[in-house]
Amino acid sequence: MDNQPIAPEDQVRASLYALLGNLLLQVPDQTTLDQLAALEGEAGDVGSAINALSQIAKSMTPASVEREYNILFIGVGRGEVLPYASYYLTGFLHEKPLADLRGKMRELGIQRKQGVSEPEDHAGALCEMMAGMISGAFGQPMPLQTQKEFFNAHIAPWAAHCFSDLEKAESAVLYAPVGSLGRLLMGIEQESFRIE
C-alpha cells in the first residue's frame, strides 16, 4: 500500500465512513462501546450526532446493543431496517444494483471482505468501501472523481433514506444517532460532490 498522506478533511471522511461501516456490519462489543463513549463531537449537526452517540454508548451494554442490533437488522423474518441498495432501489434483495456494484468493484480492484456473509450492497460494506477508497486501503487513495462516481452510482440514490429510516426506527436507541450521523454524512457528501 502506498502510504501517501491524505488531507485532514479526507481523513475525517474516511474515519466517519469506517465508523458507520463497523457499526452497521457487526454488533459493537464492549471495546467499541468504550471507544464510542469517549468520542467528542465538535459544533454543528455532525458533532451533535457524535455527542448523542457517545452519551448513549455510555449507558449500553454488549447484551443490550446486541438485542437492538438483532431487532433492527435481523429480526424474526426480517429486521426493521434492510440496509441494502437492492432493497431500497427495487424492493427486493440481490437485484441489479448488487450486480452493478460487483462490476464496479471488479473494475476498481476492490475485493469482497473475507468471511463476510452480507451482500456487498449492504450500507456498512459500502461505507467501508468509501473509507478504503479515501484512505488508500485498496492500494492508494482513489481520485476524488472516482469516489464521486462511485458514491453517485451506488450510495447517493438510497443511503440517506436508509439512514433516515434507521434514525427513526422504533427499536433504535444506540442506532438512532448512528442513523443521524449517516444521514448527515450522506448529505454533506452529496453537496460536496455536487459543487466539485
Q: What is the predicted role of each segment?
A:
Residues M1-E196:
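Surface/interface-facing alpha-helical segments and adjacent flexible terminal/loop regions used
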